A protein has these predicted regions:
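Structural and coupling elements of P-loop NTPases
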Residues: 1-363
């Protein structure tokens, strides 16, 4: 999993996978991890051996319940792939992940087309202004038609959904791109990258993840069109990483709290600027109840396993031990004064735990 000095990444990118349930999102993640050399063979949801569905309940039910990550190299970039739940009951878990994404891949079933939750996800991606690639899966099933599906994507999602095999469609999304196409017969990679980053176009790829069809093309597209405008600093007004004068100051956004099998509390965060080092003193809390705690350990997870590092740089997603008072959405460092985006979705299921009188709920 980690990177050697020979493969030191030029940039760190976080890419989220989102989908309506049963669209083949986890199967796509298995294909991506297989083709990038992270796993020896793709697992299957129905076999209960998917790399990222590693909780017993997930394997038992065949669904993703918790967002999890895997790390792989793609060209000169280190990519953190965040697999999110597709089931509507766990949408709040998915939405918390959006605030730390640089790009997203929306998976659509070619057999079912744009479904209700697909539109919800699309609206969320627009709300958080996340550049989005679309992968139309299950194109090997009888009755699927690429032309009809692309037409549906344009009608129900956005007219700027473009087939990346049709350069003329790309050119119509921007006046400068059209000039390039008319003069040179193609649109430059830099122009396409900027159009994707600005959400002017949404690249569409078609395939069948179970058979690894179209997955490499998707990876090639991400590797080619993800620009250098990421992993510099997080601008809450834009909900994305942007360059500014505070790039050397530490900043981070917490998106998840969990515990490892040993009971250690893990604060999952994205480093938005500067860097975080082991034993760094972090501050947070309200003015009336401030806290200061040290980052005991910095972990980079990939599936169930992790490696510890001495520092995490801007753009990296890590889990930190030793922090007892952090909460999802909290900003640390220069992010402390920036309000997190208020979640649009709420958990469908709610539980309340009652402790016996002799038990202190705060400990």
């Amino acid at each position: 999993m980690g990177t050697t000095s020979e493969t030191k990444p030029k940039r760190y990118i976080s890419v989220g996978l989102l989908a309506h349930v049963d669209s083949g999102k986890t199967t796509l993640s298995e294909g991506i991890l297989y083709l990038t050399g992270q796993i020896r063979k793709p697992g299957r949801v129905d076999h209960g051996d998917a790399f990222l569905d590693n909780y017993a309940l997930e394997r038992q039910r065949g669904i993703t319940i918790f967002s999890k990550q895997a790390v792989f190299q793609l060209g000169d970039s280190q990519v953190t792939l965040l697999d999110t739940p597709g089931h509507v009951d766990f949408s709040a878990e998915m939405e918390r992940t959006l605030q730390v994404l640089d790009y997203a891949v929306l998976v659509v079933s070619g057999a079912d087309g744009v479904q209700g939750h697909t539109r919800t996800l699309w609206n969320l991606l627009a709300r958080y202004r996340i550049p989005t690639f679309i992968f139309v899966n299950k194109m090997d099933q009888p009755g699927t038609d690429k032309t009809l599906i692309l037409k549906e994507l344009k009608k129900k999602l956005d007219a700027s959904c473009v087939d990346m095999e049709a350069p003329e469609d790309i050119a119509t999304g921007d006046e400068h791109a059209l000039e390039e196409y008319l003069e040179a017969g193609e649109v430059s990679i830099d122009t396409i990258s900027q159009m994707i980053a600005d959400r002017q176009i949404f690249p569409c790829y078609f395939g069948a993840a179970l058979k690894l069809q179209g997955v490499q093309e998707l990876l090639d597209g991400i590797g080619k069109y993800v620009g250098d405008n990421v992993s510099a600093n997080y601008d809450q007004a834009d909900n994305r990483l942007q360059n500014n004068g505070d790039a050397q100051q530490f900043g981070a956004r917490v998106y998840k709290i969990s515990r490892d099998p040993q009971g250690n509390r893990l604060t999952h965060m994205k480093i938005t600027s500067g860097e975080l080092k082991v034993k760094s003193l972090l501050k947070g809390g309200q003015v009336s109840e401030p806290w200061e705690e040290k980052a005991d350990q910095i972990r980079i997870y990939s599936g169930e396993k992790f490696e510890t590092v001495q520092q995490a740089k801007a753009g990296m997603i890590c889990a930190v031990t030793g922090l007892k008072h952090t909460f999802p959405g909290e900003g640390l460092g220069i992010e402390a004064g920036k309000q997190a985006v208020t979640p649009m979705l709420e958990p469908v299921l709610n539980y309340q735990v009652y402790f016996p009188d002799q038990v202190c709920a705060s400990t």
